[in-house]
Amino acid sequence: MYVCFPEPPCTEKGCYLRLVDFRGGMEVQRQKTLEAIKNHNCGFYYEQSADNFSKIPGSPVAYWVEIQMYRAFETEKIGKYAISDGQTKTGNNDKYLRMLWEVPAFEIGRGKRWVLHAKGGAFRRWYGNIDTLIDWSDSAREHYRSDHVARIAPEYIWFRRGICWTLISSNKLHGFRLLQENSTFNLAAPSIFFDDDRMMLYILGYLNSKFSQEIIALLNPTLNTNISDITSQPLNYGKSPECEDAIIELVETNISLSKSDWDSFETSWDFQIHPLLRYAALTPQRIAQEEKNGYLPMNGIADAYRHWEQACDDRFYQLKANEEELNRIFIDIYGLQDELTPEVEEKDVTVRKADLTRDVKSLISYAVGCMFGRYSLDHQGLVYAGGDWEQTYHRNVLVDEGGNAISFGGIRIAVGKNYQINVDGQWQDCTYPPEADNIIPICDDEYFEDDIVGRFVTFIETVYGKNTLEENLKFIADALGGKSQPRDVIRSYFLNDFFNDHCKIYQKRPIYWQFDSGKKNGFKALIYLHRYQPDTIARIRTDYVHEQQSRYRTAIADLEQRIAGASTAERVKLTKQLKKLQDQAEELHVYEEKIHHLADQMIAIDLDDGVKVNYAKFQDVLAKIK
């Protein structure tokens, strides 16, 4: 930037050249300077009175800003009404913060040990980015007060609705979101509050507008957005109730749209049901609509995905239109029609469109959740995440003539494998029962009847029906990018990719733990963290590892016999299979010794310690978290 100032008091305009966008050294900038001297309409020549700079807090030399922008600062500032009074800092995040899926669900909420905690996150507007918990026990809060590094926000701003954002943005734009009630926040998620809820919603709409983004760039052209950058902004409120009503209505709709998107994924605290199940139900109205649109109504995943895709598009473009309408309103309020346009680029709309591979993988994850009882086809939302398993699920049991459960040694006698689930205080048979022993093997062949592929196929058949099973499995396999038979593709996904995807989605804090013998795939099995018991590893060893070893011995003996009588060509093929089985058997032999050592210890875990601490206790027999 080159500047030519008149003498103080600077009531006349100075001349400014904006050369920062021109690359190529001083010679290029010299040429551009000469060009600007000859042609003031070149696009990078500006005239501005230095008196205007002082109208903006911090007096930035914003010579390119139009006079209407300066006049906007002649109104009240947001800081006149905003409440901001410190943030909470733990001093030891590893000890006091958890992802919301790590700890028992019954310990989460106001008045309990763990509460929701905003700590920034990716660029997102209106709602979301809260997936963290903070320890809010008496002892933890005392630590925050007394520790020389930690601090705690004053009590009067605990659990209030407000506006939060991410302190450090990797995006030129800044996303402002509703901080929901019953949440806390830390310094990575600065937050402000208001006594007037309507004003808060109005300001949330304003902050997500193009005009506000321009102001932020003036006040602080860095990646940080501090509270002072927000409280210093102009506030034009209370002058046009009709206009304010329109803004607030749009903001409330945008919050609802963003919440609907956020809650469609299972890492949300308010997740209810997977979209490909939600959109699979064929009501009479939907059947009529399908036929009207020329589709043959079928209860298949392809149809569910098509409806989900349309719902995502509707939400996406409705939010885009609403944001553009908010931009129009604020551009008109501040008279910047010649400077700003209301259009919003699609890349800046922060709700998600449908994604076939992502959504099919998340369906698989949801199915695994149903296998372990975390979710259920009979009850929406989180069903079991710690606590008394028998209060949520129980096996059908023998009863006497009076209807009382018959027990032996204090243990009720179960009948078959059927489970019942407690739905709002009423016991009913499970449509898709959870795995009884919390152990699901992942095999490269059909060694176990209840291996994960078999259970997944049953899940798909249960949800979508037997008549469409094969085409549904093919749809899933195609979405996973497989080229072989659908069941083989699905098996390969569970064997090679499921756990890694799970770790990514759950931010390296997995709730489904993969017991893994090594690269030869000699043995793999999943358990659900919240159902872990001290004897779980012993049961893995005796009921699954030993069984797998027995099957390897049988398969190896069979192959050796077949090789002895095989032709040359067939012998080569069988020998290759034999080598693979022998390698797997050897790998499993070594693994059995490791798991034997742990099984004998009957190790207990405390879910409040978090995944990182608990996983480390078994790291020698678990898959590496990547």
Which residues are covered by each model-predicted region?
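Extended Lys/Arg-rich polyanion-binding regions
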Residues: 116, 121, 166, 192, ...
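Basic, amphipathic alpha-helical recognition segments used for DNA target recognition
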Residues: 10-11, 160, 166-232, 242-243, ...
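Polynucleotide-recognition surfaces of large bacterial nucleic-acid defense/processing enzymes
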Residues: 1-147, 151-162, 245-421, 426, ...
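A generic short alpha-helical patch detector that favors 3-5-residue windows
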Residues: 180, 225, 293-300, 551
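Glycine- and acidic
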Residues: 113, 146-151, 158-160, 182-197, ...
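Terminal accessory regions of large proteins
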Residues: 268-269, 275, 281-293, 313, ...
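Short, low-complexity Ser/Thr-rich regulatory SLiMs
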Residues: 6, 167, 237-239
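Short, functionally important structural connectors and interaction interfaces within domains
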Residues: 89, 115, 119, 128, ...
